[in-house]
Amino acid sequence: YHACAFNCLYCQNYHFKKHTFSTKKITAKNLAGAVDKKTNCICYFGGDPTPQILHAIKTSKIAIKDADGRILRICWETNGAMQEPFLTMMADLSLKSGGCIKFDLKAWDPGIHHALCGVTNTKTIENFQTLAGWTKKRPQPPLLIASTLLVPGYVDEPEVSEIAGFISSLHPEIPYSLLAFYPQFYLNDLPTTSRSHALRCRDAAEKAGLRNVHIGNVHLLAEGY
């Protein structure tokens, strides 16, 4: 999906915004019709799927009905800032289909989050906490996953430690991915995440109590700072 409720300075899909007001449309029925017998997962991302969440919900319901009992997992990658009724709809679809919801927890400090994303992280934190309560309904495969982009100079060990401590207080088994940063959009003058930065953040997350921490985008890690 093209739109997003955030305006991140490092957005890797910033060019998607140009298509938000495109005259080219696709109905939920037609989008669901793209699912074939080889498809076992629909993952919505963007941008962010939540500005068009009703379209995504309708598409998912049609696709699941057409699958007629065949495995079709519904997954989401989101900033987590949706209203709670929509979160419930998303979670219900993922729970029943065997899918997951990945929250991008961009920063813990409100000032850093606002500087990087242009908005508060209050709703994201509230929704993550709410969804963590669903995890006991289906421990495996995990319903809730978290990730954080390691932006040099902004998102470092103290930030990761706070985020990880929050996640751990809800459930220490929630998977957490630390993603290497690549310069994009307005932050194209920053370096890629260094290997030492990523390793220090992984240690901080594990010390905060998380048991399932992963470093992603390893190929981007540099040997700098």
Language-model segments: residues:
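Residue-level detector of family-conserved "landmark" positions at structurally sensitive sites
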Residues: 18-21, 44, 77, 215-216
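A C-terminal junction/extension of Radical SAM enzymes
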Residues: 193-225
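Iron-sulfur (Fe-S) cluster-binding segments and ferredoxin-like electron-carrier domains
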Residues: 11-23
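Conserved AdoMet/S-adenosylmethionine-binding subsite of the radical SAM
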Residues: 26-190
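Short gly/ser-rich anion-binding loops that grip negatively charged ligand groups
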Residues: 1, 18-21, 49
